[in-house]
Swiss-Prot record:
PANTHER family: SUPPRESSOR OF TY 5, TRANSCRIPTION ELONGATION FACTOR SPT5
Gene Ontology biological-process annotations: mRNA processing; regulation of DNA-templated transcription elongation; regulation of transcription by RNA polymerase II; transcription elongation by RNA polymerase II
Protein name, entry field: Transcription elongation factor SPT5
Gene source species: Gibberella zeae (strain ATCC MYA-4620 / CBS 123657 / FGSC 9075 / NRRL 31084 / PH-1)
Alphabetical keyword list: mRNA processing, Nucleus, Transcription
Ranges of Acidic residues composition bias in the record: 64-77, 84-100, 119-140
Amino acid sequence: MSSHDPSRFDDSEDEEDFNPAPADLSDEEQDDDHQKVKRGSSPAPRDDDDDEDERPSKSRHADDDEEEEEEEEEEEDTGRRRDDDDDEDEEEEDEEDEDIQQGHRRKRRKERGANFFDIEAEVDDEDEGEDDEMLGEEIGDFITNDHPDDIAETGDDDRRHRELDRRRDMDSSMDAEKQAEILRQRYGNRRSGKGFRDVSVVPKRLLLPSVDDPSIWAVRCKEGKEREVVFSIMKRIEERAGTKDELAITAAFERGGIESVMKGFVYVEARRQTDILKGLDSMMNVYPHSKMILVDIKDMPELFRISKTPTLEPGAWVRLRRPPKHNGDLAQVIDVTENGLEARVRFIPRLDYGMRDDALSADGKRKRPFGNGPKPPQRLFSEIEARKRNPRAIQGNPSTGTWTYNNEEFENGFQVRDVKIQQLTVTDVNPSLEEVTRFASGAEDGTENLDLKALAHSLKDSNALATYLPGDVVEVYTGEQKGVVGKAMRVHSDVVSITVTEGELVGQEIDVPIRALRKRFNVGDHVKVIGGSKFRDEVGMVVNIRDDKVTILTDQTNTEITVFSKDLREASDIGGQGSLGQYSLHDLVQLDPTTVGCVVKVDRESLVALDQFGTPRQVMPSQISNKIPKRKTAVAVDRHGSEIRLEDVVKEYTGQQRQGKIIHIHRSYIFLHSNDNKEHAGVFVTKANMVNTVAAKGGRVNTAAATGPDLTAMNPALKLHKNGSENKPVPPPRSFGKDKAIEQTVVIKKGAYKGLLGIVKDTTDTHARVELHTKSKTITVPKDCLAFKNRMTGATIDIASRGGRGGYGGGAGRGGGGDRVPGWQSGSRTPMAGGNSDRVPAWGSRTPAASGRTPAWKAQDMSGARTPAWADGSRTVNPYDGSRTAYGSGGRTPAWQAGGRTPAPGDAFGAGSRTPAYGGGDSWGSGSKTPAWGVTAPTPGASGGDAWGPGSYDAPTPGGALGAPTPGAMNAPTPGAYSAPTPAAISAPTPGGWQGGWGADSAPTPAAGAPTPGYYGAPTPGASYGPPETPAATGPRYTDDD
């Protein structure tokens, strides 16, 4: 049947057979095959291959016979498959499964060359068998011993192409759904491969150790011998394997190393601890009988966790560990040996060129032990210095820049050395930009060349040390999310959760590893240096950003510095590093015995001080002799002779005419600070006699017209009141020095802060700076809106008064409103009700009464003794001016002249306030005289004037039994009106009332049964029995109690 028979195609389509039977071969194709067989049986032509020439001809004929037999069998199999196809089309799907299983059991004879090619596979149906047959035919033709020189037969090739075209036409003409159904039937029931899975994928939780696994014990060994101990254990296991002493140890390993925290231990796995003791007995460098540590099951996986060993490459940055002089110094790798055990590095040397070497002793040994003393600073090697100090020890070539000094190699100023890898720190190097810049090589044009690639490689691990806080603005600079900008929300280990603020992912929260992040700043941000840099704690404004480097302008020195962004953080404060040890900014320090300086800059290791001559000097803290404490009482004189003190504002009158506030005064030099001066942190120095005072602290204003003290205040003649104006209040004297209002407790009387309590911190002529207690803030308030309070009692006080105390009310002046002493008709009540508030003592409050006056004038009078005598010249005090003795009194006691009276007569109304006073024009004023003229009121004052009444005896002045009568003669006068008034009856009654009396109701005395001792023995002078003696009463003198 022809392969192009349409009926055959229709039958195949109706029977849903996708693979039709092979078409019959034409005569020409059969002839071609026959000729092909004949050529296969004929001897193959010789070629250049030796293997083909040596092959026997008999074996070739045998192979040809086998090929003929195999082709005949293939034709028979093809016919059987054709019959099977017809049968399968008529059977049901269940029978197809049985036929498939039978087809699996059929065996075919292997073709020649099958041992070298995997060309056979089991199939589920005859369709696939037919495909395998075609594949076998192609492979058979492929391995046929055809010689390249044979003429290619195009007939067979054309047949195969026609067959391929026919199959493609069938596939293209078939409906897609029908084709899918055929494929489902063909491959749907295939079960080959089911149940086979990738056994290599095992959950990690199944690999974790459990209680059924052997235990791991940590056994101590000699440090550095961990690996040798493990090899010894494994060797012993191999030697005793299969013997009666076979070890029960299953494994042994170590995790030693220079930086390892587990060095000094070997870890042995066994079921029992006795197995380990038996296996390690008599082994060197291991101590099994010491305390062994059982490793917990949860800690076992950590013992097997392997960390990647960092590899060194030329150009990488490392830090030295040895020698101790260079411990921690940054170095750059030049080359690494092939075995990876040593590296050649270059670093900045620390040489003193023998300046600290002591002279050799007699035996030729050094006196100073090696390693003592501070480290020399890092400086590039100098051939000139070396030749100057020790010319014998230097050798080299100036043209190449290579030198040998004290058996050390130097190239281009750097020291070069071969160092073991164990003596280097290769992780977390974190080089600062300043350190790396010192390694930069100079180009011909003078610019610096920096190996940014090597620097980035070294900083890759150091980014893990960067600190991120919630709120930091960060940027992803590497990885798939490169360019994403967000704000840090949470930091967990080495992962930062950020909320995206820019880009397509706005509002989303993503997790980014710290190594892929860097902080982002904008020009104008106020930042602070926080990382490991010499500029640490500097504060400034961002002025330039380039990649990961940020340039800021410092607030303190107004200089530009460049640091990495990871070393910055946004700052809200203004200022910089203010202290280094015990020295702070603007401290006055002693530089040498004759020179002082003010600290104007503080670095990490040094200070910059502006000396008294205006020269800045950079010094180490160890070079400073001591710190001079600030003397708040220091005083200097300006060019006009006015006093200037700390915090006064002055201005130069020559030169630059700078103005500033005084921060230090040292002899004739003053150090000033000005916010307008940008040099030396705003500090400058000048001489005191070269400035004018602008404003003094506390409101003092010194000008050329008013300089020096007020000499008029020292002339008492100018203080007299003329033309009867003695009652007019004298204006407060001009204050000198510190304002009295400073540090006083005040209450605000007006304004928005009315009623609030505070402390005055600073004042001017009209205003005061008050620090409030409640709101913790300082405000400016006019002085007339303040009421000054006593901080202990809370009473209102007058800070401008210079007089005595105004009674027990706590006033500092001469009695104010409500502080009159004593009261009228109250028996010594304080204050007087309704009296003149300015007069002390007030009208009608005579203290003491007539019977207690001392000394006596006109002693024969029953009115008692007057104090002081009439018209005396020593009356004190002036009612208008503190406690000043009246001018012109002459100091007489007593005195008759009226000029010595205080106040001078002439004002009848004012007589009542004179102490004492006599002869006032107003008769009622006599009640205010002390003692009153012609009044016999006892002490305390009774309402009656009867000298024989009990008032003079009922409440005598308290005192001990004859030990302290009141008042004593000559040595215990009656207290003055200002210094010790008699307490009032209501607020402070006189104790010791006896048998009632006229004064008992107004001034009751507790403990009526306890009269004042010594009543009859020491009565108050001036009693009614007779003229009292002065000094002394009629009774006995004082006696001391034993």
